[in-house]
């Protein structure tokens, strides 16, 4: 019987890189993992990081490097770099360590599952029809060159008394093919009748396996 699994975790260290790059012994591992989660939760709540597609955390000799992948780098950097400096100061206060912040621009936001999911969530919160938001997202993703896309929403859709799920799919989205580069993300829309969950799968084509050097020590590295 087939089981549901996360496409990203399923392919981590095979065709996808880890989102946390560090080594921790038995005493440090739990501490580092909790710290990573706190860093990510903190950044997700910052207005300047609302257009962020993801965060990568690296550790080296007592320092932390956080790479913010975003479609709006100017918003994260701020006027004359003021926002980045503010983030550094707040992260240092949160972790007690020196934190370096790098900004990486997402060149094609239409092909990023997290940005697509967030976009659908924002439309639903603005009372746009969930079907219209889903179909518009599918069209923009396919127009951008994806081989396939699937979007699913769950909850009290359109204020219905009974929660249900609806999904739309266009193209090919293989879930068991490891070499398939599947970008997957989730988001939630807070509405007056409850929370609507959104899931997005995007097939970006086939991808070669990640070189062993890129995931050495993967067993001791957390992908939070």
UniProtKB/Swiss-Prot annotation:
Protein family membership: Belongs to the universal ribosomal protein uS3 family.
Gene Ontology MF annotations: mRNA binding; rRNA binding; structural constituent of ribosome
Record text on subunit structure and interactions: Part of the 30S ribosomal subunit. Forms a tight complex with proteins S10 and S14.
PANTHER family: 30S/40S RIBOSOMAL PROTEIN S3, SMALL RIBOSOMAL SUBUNIT PROTEIN US3C
Superkingdom field: Bacteria
Name of this chain's protein: Small ribosomal subunit protein uS3
Lineage: Bacteria, Pseudomonadati, Chlamydiota, Chlamydiia, Chlamydiales
Function: Binds the lower part of the 30S subunit head. Binds mRNA in the 70S ribosome, positioning it for translation.
Pfam families, per database record: KH_2, Ribosomal_S3_C
Disulfide bonds: none
Positions of transmembrane segments: none
Alphabetized UniProt keyword annotations: Ribonucleoprotein, Ribosomal protein, RNA-binding, rRNA-binding
Protein encoded by which gene: rpsC
One GO cellular component, as annotated: cytosolic small ribosomal subunit
Residue stretches making up the KH type-2 domain: 39-107
GO terms, biological process: translation
